[in-house]
Amino acid sequence: MKVRVFTFFKIFSIIIIEDEKLKRIGNLWDKIISYDNLYLAYKKAREGRGHLESVKRFEQNIEGNLKQLQQSLINKTFSTSRYNTRIIYEPKKRVIYILPFFPDRILQHALMNIIAPIFHARFIKDTYACIPERGLHAGLVRANSYTQKNDYCLKMDVKKFYPSIHHETLYKIIERKIKDENVLWLINNIIHSFEGDRNCPIGNLTSQWFGNIYLTQLDYFIKQKLRAKYYIRYCDDFLIFSNDKMWLNQCREEITQFLDNVLKLKMSKCDLFPVSRGVDFLGYRYFKGYVLLRKRTARGIIRRLRKLYSEYDKGRIKPDKMLSHLSSVDGYISWANSYNFRQKIDLNNRISEVRKCLKIYRSIVISAQTIT
């Protein structure tokens, strides 16, 4: 099968591989800046953050602060705050950007409350990261299914994806769908809140969505132009399966060109191999007939459990929280053929012991409440 070379790469700085008959959407601004939407955004933004001083200060006058934020949007005086940064290693080094001003977070939720459904409707069914009602487990089920049906896999990874997102290209992609000038002003403000012409800060709610919106162009290119039947993407990692090794090799060349010329991205990893070698994806390794945990995943679980056991033995973690942690590990490894690993970490016995302790702990709490 010969894959056509697309000469329009040299003509257009950006293309959309979607149905061109789709209309641009307007009349969104009033919905975004409505008090009800801002209040809903505030409730979402405070989840898990109610203990922070910035949130507590904001909540001293919720209505007044929300109306002040609303007025800054009406007057177009709002500007995204400067970011604080934090470095994490999960598993590799990443720079996380944190907005110190709580209203910034509220604003991003307010924006996405309204525009997220518009873009969500355009996402293909086989992209899973940071999308409501989809997630890691749905992705691994699909990856396992595709492994069983094919002999070869093309695995590709975008190099430093979020730091490499091109601001102007992202804006043009969004502009092809949104025509409300006020909304575009706000989106442009967020996109260009980071100095330079690239980077979509990891840590922003909008970055999760912008990343998927950006790579939706790749999804449609692969599905519609290359006609890949077995394709799956999780963030910037993606797989294409086929029984035709030569066709996959041609796909690799076309995808590399598309990323370079249209999305202004570079490939980091690219591997074409038989699935009999095992398909490494989302923390698991898929073979025909069975699934294993990745070695790195297993090592990470062991490290995590050692830390949890240490904290639990010192009384720093209560039995109910410990049981929740162990149940999470149990659920995660249950997706793989993990009998030997489960025996190695003695998970079943640990869960049984914690359940007994939890029963005793609850009886003591109830007795204490009765006495009081």
Each model region followed by its residue ranges:
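Short, conserved non-catalytic motifs in the polymerase core
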Residues: 48-57, 81-108, 122-134, 190-212
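Short coil/turn segments at secondary-structure boundaries
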Residues: 41-44, 54-58, 80-87, 123-128, ...
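Right-hand nucleic-acid polymerase module
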Residues: 109, 249, 267-372
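Conserved polymerase palm-domain catalytic core
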Residues: 65, 72-73, 91, 125-126, ...
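Non-catalytic, well-ordered alpha-helical scaffold segments
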Residues: 26, 36-39, 63, 67, ...
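Active-site-proximal segment of RNA-dependent polymerases
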Residues: 3-19, 24-28, 112-166
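Active-site-flanking structural segment that lines cofactor/substrate pockets
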Residues: 62-93
